């Protein structure tokens, strides 16, 4: 029995194409002829073993029983190797096919057949153990690849979720900073408008007072000129009036100067406050630019992660193809070619990538679903550029 025929044991019964009746009968007839030749040769030699020869008619009857019960023997051998039946059942089957063994009377032909059968069974069992071990190794390797692919996919999904959460937080902070900045700008503009109005009023008041002082000086000069043309009056009367007028005007001038000093102090305070607001505005603008730079960095990191994800997927597909090529070049490829389609294990090295492509992919920004990873990446880049 060859290695190719040994794989039939995996099923419940052997294929008719692999074990035809004509071939079985020809093998039985050939074995019968060999047994007859062995008996003829041993009859010419002195007996060395205490055994009684069996007649030719009994040998022919055993061949007929072997021909009719070959399928049952094959099934019992398969069940015994697979551990489905006990050794006693197989012994009873052998004794039923070789009745001479029960009476300790066996021909050389039966002994040779029994030895060949046991040799074939042992070789078949060893081959099945090797095939089962190989298939178990392939199964473990496939499970390991699938688990690694699932772990990578889970890690990438978690990282995308973290990036999405950070983007959402930065977006909220950006909106809050914009609102605060707009509010402060409005306050600064309102305060600046009020200060401009006060400065205009102060300028008008100072200009009015200055014009009044100039007019009074002109009047004083005119009065001095007219003083020479008029008749001299008592000096003490005119001097007292003029002194009172000068004192009064001096008081007005001092009062205007004091108000001017107060307004200047108010203007300085407003300028200091304006400088503080300006510094706050510049700091906020710097923070906003910093946040924009961090956002660009996060976008670059996200795109690099997407490229790295694509490279890993392509590398995984290439490794699956390489493993598939190696598996087809193994020495067991010739043996597996004779398996039936329902008995042949199907190894799909690209199963992880196909399951990844069959699952629905969603955009982390707009939650739009896609079927292809490349389309999703281009859409995510467009969404990030829009935002």
Swiss-Prot record:
Q: Where in the cell is it found?
A: Cytoplasm; Nucleus
Q: Does the keyword Cytoplasm apply?
A: yes
Write out the coiled-coil annotation as residue ranges: 60-331
Which Gene3D superfamilies does the annotation name? Nemo cc2-lz domain - 1d5 darpin complex
GO terms, molecular function = K63-linked polyubiquitin modification-dependent protein binding; zinc ion binding
- Where along this sequence does the record place binding of Zn(2+)? 363, 366, 379, 383
Give the residue ranges for region: Leucine-zipper: 302-332
Q: Which InterPro entries match?
A: CC2-LZ_dom (IPR032419), NEMO_ZF (IPR034735), Optineurin/NFkB_EssMod (IPR051301)
What's this chain's function? Essential signaling component in transmitting the lipopolysaccharide (LPS) signal leading to cact degradation, which is required for NF-kappa-B (Rel) activation. Required for antibacterial immune response.
Instruction: Report quaternary structure and partners.
Output: Interacts with IKKbeta to form the I-kappa-B kinase complex.
Q: What is the protein named?
A: NF-kappa-B essential modulator
Which species is listed as the source? Drosophila melanogaster
Q: Encoded by which gene?
A: key
């Amino acid at each position: 029995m060859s290695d190719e025929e040994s794989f039939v044991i995996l099923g419940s019964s052997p294929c008719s194409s692999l074990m035809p009746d004509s071939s079985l009968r020809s093998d039985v007839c050939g074995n019968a002829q060999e047994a007859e030749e062995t008996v003829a040769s041993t009859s010419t030699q002195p007996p060395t073993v205490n055994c009684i020869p069996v007649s030719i008619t009994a040998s022919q009857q055993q061949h007929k029983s072997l021909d009719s019960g070959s399928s049952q023997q094959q099934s019992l051998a398969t069940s015994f190797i697979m551990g489905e039946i006990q050794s006693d059942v197989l012994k009873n089957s052998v004794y039923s096919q070789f009745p001479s063994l029960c009476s300790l009377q066996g021909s050389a032909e039966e002994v040779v057949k029994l030895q060949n059968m046991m040799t074939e069974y042992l070789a078949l069992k060893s081959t099945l153990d090797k095939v089962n071990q190989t298939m178990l190794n392939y199964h473990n390797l496939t499970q390991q690849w699938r688990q690694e692919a699932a772990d990578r996919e889970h890690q990438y999904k978690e990282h995308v979720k973290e990036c999405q959460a950070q983007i959402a937080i930065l977006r909220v902070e950006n909106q809050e900073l914009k609102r605060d900045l707009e509010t402060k700008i409005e306050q600064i503009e309102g305060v600046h408008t009020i200060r401009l109005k006060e400065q205009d009023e102060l300028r008008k008041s100072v200009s009015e007072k200055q014009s009044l002082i100039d007019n009074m000086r002109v009047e004083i000069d005119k009065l001095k000129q007219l003083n020479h043309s008029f008749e001299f009056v008592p000096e003490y009367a005119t001097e007292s009036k003029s002194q009172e007028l000068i004192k009064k005007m001096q008081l007005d001038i001092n009062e205007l100067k004091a108000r001017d000093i107060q307004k200047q102090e108010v203007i300085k305070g407003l300028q200091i406050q304006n400088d503080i607001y300006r510094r706050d505005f510049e700091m906020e603008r710097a923070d906003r630019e910093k946040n924009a730079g961090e956002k660009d960095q996060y976008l670059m990191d996200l795109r690099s992660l997407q490229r790295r994800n694509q490279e890993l997927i392509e590398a995984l597909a290439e490794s699956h193809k390489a493993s598939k090529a190696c598996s087809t070049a193994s020495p067991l490829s010739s043996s597996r070619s004779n398996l039936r389609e329902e008995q042949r294990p199907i190894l799909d090295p690209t199963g992880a990538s196909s399951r990844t492509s069959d699952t629905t992919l969603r955009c982390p920004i707009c939650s739009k679903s896609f079927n292809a990873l490349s389309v999703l990446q281009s859409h995510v880049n467009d969404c990030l550029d829009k935002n």
